[in-house]
Amino acid sequence: MASPVAIAAQAGKLLRERALRPLLAVRSQAGHLTPRRWLNLQEYQSKKLMSEHGVRVQRFFVANTAKEALEAAKRLNAKEIVLKAQILAGGRGKGVFNSGLKGGVHLTKDPKVVGELAQQMIGYNLATKQTPKEGVKVNKVMVAEALDISRETYLAILMDRSHNGPVIVGSPQGGVDIEEVAASSPELIFKEQIDIFEGIKDSQAQRMAENLGFLGSLKNQAADQITKLYHLFLKIDATQVEVNPFGETPEGQVVCFDAKINFDDNAEFRQKDIFAMDDKSENEPIENEAARYDLKYIGLDGNIACFVNGAGLAMATCDIIFLNGGKPANFLDLGGGVKEAQVYEAFKLLTSDPKVEAILVNIFGGIVNCAIIANGITKACRELELKVPLVVRLEGTNVQEAQNILKSSGLPITSAVDLEDAAKKAVASVAKK
């Protein structure tokens, strides 16, 4: 059996890896990319799911108007009320509305104030560090009972590839950046590996509750909540359920105060109700258009469009462009099961961006057939009358056939032997202008 120190170190490593996964955020040398999860739930939606599965959360209502917010505050009849703007981006507390109101999270004891604040939130844009400069329009607010927290802990359930199954990770130090805790105090990180076939054992839930510092009757409460969170994790096909803080109140209740839930996109066919909750209103129109064709698109500030298959290769392409003195205009992931029509639509999206001065295609054909890519490229170039330089690097399945298609097309397409060569040629084509 591994020592407690080894387990803590492994759990800390898992948390740091979790922070780097594309489901949350990806940092590239080319800039800060924040890929939107293809299913992204608002805070109130996550809490509703938890509540429906027996997990204890604060009492709350959702309001679409200031009048509804006022009525909700009265119905709560709470000592103190917290009003939260509902957007997907983080940093709401320090955000600023274009109505002049500062802060997307407010505490008050007066229901009247809730109505007044909601009037300055709903229908206005809230700008935070994670939104575009102009902010994101707030369509709903959450009116919740504000509970005192006497102690904060951290709890997460996530998939661990090294274990080939779910793992529960916890720390008695919650309400803070858990990656920092894992790095500075790994002994405060605890881990329970769950057998996917047997499920969570009561002894595991009790042990985690004890490691989080819950004592007496609170220990049983915490273990019960941990078990319910695990069952929720399985039932909704989550890849991660993170509760921070997972805390206790002065009245002796264990409550999940805030939660982030990530889902397995491949489970959409059996989680239709959950996926129907996805709010795409905060997306850029081009992102929604890309999603119609199973393309993943993220706009950036540069002038070299990237057309790539696979998120990892897309990030590497952005980095190489940056290292060669260029700036990527986007992050476009074509994915695996490619059709010629997708290639055509991808080019339509890329050429619709007025910032784009060159296009770099970087495809590694494992599942992808390079010949299909080549046919899609030539069709797009002809029908869209492409006016910007096009650099193409293809490698893998049917690459020779693909190269012959490009060569015989008679189109002004620049071929590249590898990614470095492609990036240099794309950057040079823009520099000539």
Swiss-Prot record:
Source organism per UniProt: Mus musculus
Binding site for substrate: N309, G366, I367, V368
Site (Important for substrate specificity): E80, D148
Protein's recorded name: Succinate--CoA ligase [GDP-forming] subunit beta, mitochondrial
Cofactor: Mg(2+)
Transit peptide: 1-38
Organism ancestry: Eukaryota, Metazoa, Chordata, Craniata, Vertebrata
Binding, GTP: Q58, G91, R92, G93, L147
Purpose of the protein: GTP-specific succinyl-CoA synthetase functions in the citric acid cycle (TCA), coupling the hydrolysis of succinyl-CoA to the synthesis of GTP and thus represents the only step of substrate-level phosphorylation in the TCA. The beta subunit provides nucleotide specificity of the enzyme and binds the substrate succinate, while the binding sites for coenzyme A and phosphate are found in the alpha subunit.
Recorded catalytic activity of this chain's protein: GTP + succinate + CoA = succinyl-CoA + GDP + phosphate
Main location per the UniProt record: mitochondrion
Alphabetical keyword list: Acetylation, GTP-binding, Ligase, Magnesium, Metal-binding, Mitochondrion, Nucleotide-binding, Phosphoprotein, Transit peptide, Tricarboxylic acid cycle
UniProt pathway annotation: Carbohydrate metabolism; tricarboxylic acid cycle; succinate from succinyl-CoA (ligase route): step 1/1
